[in-house]
């Protein structure tokens, strides 16, 4: 992890502060940006989100799915957590905390919007940062690559139905055409574009050329992420100044679900006798979220001023420190993990 990525929480916090201040003092400018949209797609946000997502997807080798059979137990556990546990546990936690336990501290009528953001966050398995987490816990690189490729392929067809199901169960209305448009814009098109660009770069310049391009695009992707956050918090500056406690309250269910899902994946892998070098990244992939996609979908579905967009951004704020703590737990418990029952 580079110096910039290592301090991502600091940069995110600074962008949140700057965006909130600018939105509070320059509301007219941000209102004009918010109106720059076509078919409910905010154009400045769409450009930034593509710049943010495509370089990350460029790292994914979909040919690695041929290796899935080598680690079928770890793959199975991770798929179970990512698609059958995490989205549903997040919806449940959001319902318990935001609709009930914290209802008195939240802005009236916003709980459902925050829950929608949490669902969008949990339904998208992490794509890019898991390579960093896997490396930090000495994970099997082939397992990580094949798991990420498989998750991304599943996400193309499963993200919209899972999100629609959970939003429906939470009594949150979302038009299918808007959801399909968001999936097309922010999953299908970027996946196809990244896969085609990756193939072209490998054909013309080889692996070394691809890695050189990835190094150059890395800062661009992170800069787009930070500008996206600045815009999001600028759009919501006044609301945040009036309700600073909201961010801390939204973070509570996110924190619980990260540690719950990481722990569950880790323990199930141990019960199945899976090697630690696979169980570590399995737990990390099971717990982390593709927050870039969640932000994009929240903006497309509910708008830049929505509580859903704010909830997904809280996921960005806490992602790095929380996942680093999971890495430390995985590494510190390796001796215990490898002592068979």
Q: Where would I find each of the regions flagged by the language model?
A:
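Alpha-helical transmembrane segments of multi-pass small-molecule/ion transporters
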Residues: 1-59, 63-287, 291-341
